[in-house]
Amino acid sequence: MVRLKKSFGQHLLVSEGVLKKIAEELNIEEGNTVVEVGGGTGNLTKVLLQHPLKKLYVIELDREMVENLKSIGDERLEVINEDASKFPFCSLGKELKVVGNLPYNVASLIIENTVYNKDCVPLAVFMVQKEVAEKLQGKKDTGWLSVFVRTFYDVNYVMTVPPRFFVPPPKVQSAVIKLVKNEKFPVKDLKNYKKFLTKIFQNRRKVLRKKIPEELLKEAGINPDARVEQLSLEDFFKLYRLIEDSGE
């Protein structure tokens, strides 16, 4: 019997209806390559294999779970014992659909890694904490990761999933989100862009002129006395380009 490890933040989704809904949101067609993050006991893996995909890669860090997944025995399935928060998705193909019930303690890192691999991931469907889903949409306590993701993807809220649909039940509500690639602004150096965003989100209560030269804010058409949460997606990009060009 497979044991769940608390350190991995594992909560297994056991609702057949929700599992099917997640798979449906991927719009799997014949010839598609799908990457599942954190296959666990294979509940979602088995549902995905009911679709006409060409190849299913499952990235799973827990070695005990890896052996369990391999026992499914489908020739289209390949299990990879790696950390999905660092794994180069694009090494698996040029166009991938990524999916997963993400462990809560590393969900943000996996989503960040998905953005770094955006050139080969036009679509991703993830289960995350409801609070994380709302933040990513920019509807609640927007942070740097929300802006980072929304620069390259539309974030769609699919459904809320209550704790009773998991084993063991988490203490919080969960949600399914769908990321659809829609690069709104051309950013070449993603690590530099992340550095800019994390810096601007530090000391959120400070007005922007305390963090960024006032002349750059005015050139971007931004009120120097505004705070970071008042900026639009376009504001962030304009400011980033100006700072990049000025060498600040």
Swiss-Prot record:
Q: Where is this site: Interaction with RNA?
A: 105, 198, 202, 204
The record's EC number reads 2.1.1.182
User: In the UniProt record, does the keyword rRNA processing occur?
Assistant: yes
Mind listing the UniProt keywords for this protein, alphabetically?
Cytoplasm, Methyltransferase, RNA-binding, rRNA processing, S-adenosyl-L-methionine, Transferase
Binding-site positions, S-adenosyl-L-methionine: 11, 13, 38, 60, 83, 101
| InterPro entries xrefs | KsgA/Erm, rRNA_Ade_diMease-like_C, rRNA_Ade_Mease_Trfase_CS, rRNA_Ade_methylase_Trfase_N, rRNA_adenine_dimethylase, SAM-dependent_MTases_sf
Q: GO molecular-function annotation terms? A: 16S rRNA (adenine(1518)-N(6)/adenine(1519)-N(6))-dimethyltransferase activity; RNA binding; rRNA (adenine-N6,N6-)-dimethyltransferase activity
This protein's GO cellular component annotations are: cytosol
Catalytic reaction(s) noted: adenosine(1518)/adenosine(1519) in 16S rRNA + 4 S-adenosyl-L-methionine = N(6)-dimethyladenosine(1518)/N(6)-dimethyladenosine(1519) in 16S rRNA + 4 S-adenosyl-L-homocysteine + 4 H(+)
Q: Please state where this protein is localized.
A: Cytoplasm
One GO-annotated biological process of the protein: rRNA methylation
Pfam families tied to this protein:
RrnaAD
Regarding protein family, the annotation reads:
Belongs to the class I-like SAM-binding methyltransferase superfamily. rRNA adenine N(6)-methyltransferase family. RsmA subfamily.
Instruction: List, alphabetically, the HAMAP family matched.
Output: 16SrRNA_methyltr_A
According to its UniProt entry, what is the function of this protein? Specifically dimethylates two adjacent adenosines (A1518 and A1519) in the loop of a conserved hairpin near the 3'-end of 16S rRNA in the 30S particle. May play a critical role in biogenesis of 30S subunits.
What name has this protein been given in UniProt?
Answer: Ribosomal RNA small subunit methyltransferase A
Organism of derivation: Aquifex aeolicus (strain VF5)
Name the gene.
rsmA
